[in-house]
């Protein structure tokens, strides 16, 4: 039995709409994306296999919203909702924001793939274009700490796209699930812990130490964002260089 037949048959037997449902399960097992009560947005969600997996993962206290220009047949889950529209249209984004109802989004998913031409370079470029569209939506609606999963085909434009994702998240990992077909060049980039800091690594700025943390490092506040700086005292006015950023805090060093 081929891998394709195995996952296809399992999906039929276990009630999943697509064999790709197992890809998301395997990605979550590797990267630890979902948690109970999470709010999840699935872009290009038709026919709904990933919606099913996400709903199971977040449980009855969670919310899962699928967006697609195709109609998504209703699922037997009270926590799943769908929006029919183009995810790049502002009207669709507004409908999504309204449906989320000001709750924090925890995860944005995209398993979108282009219509295949058979020309590898063309198919790769189109897949990166779709991935960038999903990335744009994710950076628009994900708060600090949120996660992003996106499918993309391997090729020359992948490194630049991955670098762009890396600037918005604490780290990025590439996953190729066992459920992917052997003939496919697909992989999934997982951006973990969205960063929304008002500064970037390498930035230099003048600031005042407003407090001392539990580990003895000074605390600087930049538009509400915390930077830890070693070797300073409370009240010091210093010039610092940002060295590293996390979703909620960053680190800097004094410039001598």
Curated annotation (Swiss-Prot):
Q: One Pfam family this chain carries?
A: TRAM
Q: What is one term from the GO cellular component aspect held by the record?
A: cytoplasm
What range(s) does the TRAM domain occupy?
198-256
Q: Quote the Gene3D superfamilies the UniProt record gives.
A: Nucleic acid-binding proteins, Vaccinia Virus protein VP39
EC number(s) per entry: 2.1.1.166
Q: Where is the active site?
A: 151 (proton acceptor)
Localization, UniProt = Cytoplasm
Q: Which residues bind S-adenosyl-L-methionine?
A: 48, 50, 68, 86, 111
Q: Report the main location listed first in the record.
A: cytoplasm
UniProt-recorded Gene Ontology molecular function terms: rRNA (uridine-2'-O-)-methyltransferase activity
The question of whether Amino-acid biosynthesis is a record keyword is answered with no
Q: Which domain of life is it from?
A: Archaea
Which reaction is this enzyme known to catalyze? uridine(2552) in 23S rRNA + S-adenosyl-L-methionine = 2'-O-methyluridine(2552) in 23S rRNA + S-adenosyl-L-homocysteine + H(+)
Q: Which PROSITE patterns match?
A: TRAM (PS50926)
The answer to keyword Transit peptide applying to this record is: no
What keywords were assigned to this record?
Cytoplasm, Methyltransferase, rRNA processing, S-adenosyl-L-methionine, Transferase
Q: Which InterPro entries does its entry note?
A: NA-bd_OB-fold, RNA_methyltr_RlmE, RNA_MeTrfase_FtsJ_dom, rRNA-MeTfrase_E, SAM-dependent_MTases_sf, TRAM_dom
Q: What does this protein's UniProt record list under function?
A: Specifically methylates the uridine in position 2552 of 23S rRNA at the 2'-O position of the ribose in the fully assembled 50S ribosomal subunit.
Q: Which HAMAP family match?
A: RNA_methyltr_E
Protein family (similarity comment)? Belongs to the class I-like SAM-binding methyltransferase superfamily. RNA methyltransferase RlmE family.
The name this protein carries in UniProt is Ribosomal RNA large subunit methyltransferase E
Species lineage: Archaea, Methanobacteriati, Methanobacteriota, Stenosarchaea group, Halobacteria
């Amino acid at each position: 039995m081929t891998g394709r037949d195995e996952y296809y048959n399992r999906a039929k037997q276990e009630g999943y709409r697509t064999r790709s449902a197992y890809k998301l399960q395997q990605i979550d097992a590797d990267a630890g994306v979902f948690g109970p009560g999470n709010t999840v947005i699935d872009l290009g969600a038709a026919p709904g296999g990933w919606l099913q997996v996400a709903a199971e993962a977040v449980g009855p206290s969670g919310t899962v919203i699928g967006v697609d220009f195709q109609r998504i047949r209703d699922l037997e889950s009270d926590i799943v909702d769908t929006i029919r529209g183009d995810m790049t249209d502002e009207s669709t984004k507004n409908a999504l924001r309204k449906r989320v109802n000001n709750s924090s989004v925890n995860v944005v998913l995209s398993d979108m793939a282009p219509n295949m031409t058979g020309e590898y370079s063309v198919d790769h470029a189109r897949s990166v274009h779709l991935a960038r569209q999903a990335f744009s939506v994710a950076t628009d609606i994900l708060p600090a700490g949120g996660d992003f999963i996106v499918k993309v085909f391997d090729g020359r434009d992948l490194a630049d796209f991955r670098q762009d994702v890396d600037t918005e998240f604490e780290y990025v990992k590439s996953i190729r699930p066992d459920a992917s077909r052997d003939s496919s060049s697909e992989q999934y980039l997982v951006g973990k812990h969205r960063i929304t800091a008002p500064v970037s690594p390498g930035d230099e700025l003048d600031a005042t130490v407003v407090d001392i943390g539990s580990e003895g490092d000074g605390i600087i506040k930049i538009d509400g964002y915390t930077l830890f700086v070693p070797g300073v005292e409370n009240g010091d006015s210093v010039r610092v260089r940002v060295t590293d950023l996390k979703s909620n805090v960053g680190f800097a060093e004094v410039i001598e």
